[in-house]
Regions:
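Surface-exposed loop/turn motifs in large extracellular/passenger domains
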Residues: 1-354, 358-375, 379-389
Length: 389
């Protein structure tokens, strides 16, 4: 059992906070406040003309894992809701556990992922199961910020290299806040890279990617690269990708691997392009933002994808009181949906889908029931679409 509770700020080129280069037989548990940057300043100035290369050095990841962890990885925190024993130490708040709600806050400023689970190109990485039942369980806050122009930001990246692989047992669960933001660069929330695999992404908190740019950049909350593998995504929280500016792309979920076959949504999946006005004091309106706003892009899939949007269920955790009910988002998919050449199915049984749906080829099906609403266009390349209302 490796428990890391510290408060730490690290600075300098390639500097990190937690580095795992050797196998851990038990679990890795991280709490406290962590901040990593290679920059001279993490405050974005109005002008960078006085900054030289030493002021803009790139730091490393706050948490870099390059070896196996038998008992999984937990970023501690309150999680989805305030329970009687959030830290799982057997002592409840009513019994005097003053640290029960202590949540990790892990921040990176620069291009390095906040959490990187990546191989060295030689050895495989296996992340086992935590006591909560997941391989990677984020109950606290993770944030990545590029800060300066042309610096991409990534909150979580899991990837193999060469012939070596990364396997996350029993999925990834996000229970609080994971975010990435960039200026004139791209932002990525969770990236499942080549040679990386996990069974499910269970998103119960807020997962966000935000970009401010007048260049052709992108904000993507969930990205599965070609060569990655993740068959299921279940969202009961909010997945939000936003691009502020004139041109670019906002994508909630993009699968380039063709392995994502089931998406369950009882929360919100949102992709937005938001025009910005450089001079709000004048009478000239901001130019419209142009580019794709895609909630779900599984167009690389050839075997068929099922998207289920259904009613919310009471959060099943340690207590009998559903304390987070007031924080639940309105059930919706806002943005376009791009499907592939397989037999795809959309079951819209609660809430709204607002956006155009491209079914592609295959024997596809769209079912709308229970007063759910669809607003948008529908295209199907081969005419083999069945609609049930």
């Amino acid at each position: 059992h490796q428990f890391i509770p510290f408060t730490q700020s690290a600075g300098g080129q390639n500097t990190g906070a937690v580095l795992v280069n050797g196998d851990i037989g038990g679990d890795l548990v991280i709490n406290g406040s962590w901040s990593v940057s290679g920059y001279h300043s993490i405050g974005r100035p109005s002008s960078v003309t006085n900054l030289d290369a030493d002021d803009l050095q790139q730091g490393g990841s706050a948490v870099a894992i390059h070896a196996s962890v038998g008992g999984g990885v937990t970023i501690e925190g309150m999680g989805v809701e305030d329970d009687v024993d959030d830290d799982g130490d057997g002592i409840t708040e009513s019994a005097g556990d003053t640290n029960d709600d202590l949540s990790a806050t892990i921040l990176t400023y620069g291009s390095a992922p906040t959490i990187a689970i990546e191989t060295d190109g030689v050895n495989n990485i296996v992340i086992g199961t935590t006591s909560s039942g997941y391989g990677l369980h984020v109950q606290g806050t993770l944030a990545a910020s590029g800060v300066y122009d042309n610096v991409d930001a990534t909150a979580i990246r899991i990837a193999g290299s060469g012939a070596s692989t990364v396997s996350i047992a029993d999925g990834i669960t996000l229970d609080r806040l994971v975010s990435a933001g960039a200026s004139n660069g791209s932002a990525y929330g969770v990236v499942i890279g080549p040679n990386a695999s996990t069974s499910v992404l269970l998103q119960r908190g807020v997962l966000a990617a935000n970009v401010t740019s007048d260049n052709a950049e992108e904000a993507v909350s969930v990205l599965i690269n070609a060569g990655g593998n993740m068959p299921t995504l279940t969202n009961s929280g909010t997945i939000r990708s936003q691009l502020f500016g004139e041109i670019g792309a906002a994508t909630g979920i993009r699968d380039q691997s063709g392995t994502l076959t089931t998406i369950n949504n009882t929360g919100a999946i949102i992709a937005l392009l938001i025009p910005t006005d450089a001079d709000p004091a004048d009478s000239i309106p901001a130019p419209p933002a142009t580019g794709p706003a895609v909630a779900i892009d599984v167009s690389a899939n050839t075997t068929g994808v099922t998207i289920n949007q259904t009613a919310d269920v009471v959060f099943n955790d340690e207590d009998t009181v559903d304390d987070d009910v007031n924080a639940r988002p309105t059930i919706q998919i806002y943005g376009d949906i791009l499907l592939g050449s397989g037999a795809d199915t959309i079951n819209l049984l609660k809430g709204d889908i607002i956006g155009d749906v491209s079914f592609g080829a295959g024997a596809d099906s769209l079912t709308i029931n229970n007063a759910a609403r669809f607003a948008g266009g529908i295209t199907d390349s081969d005419g083999a679409l069945t609609i049930n209302v």
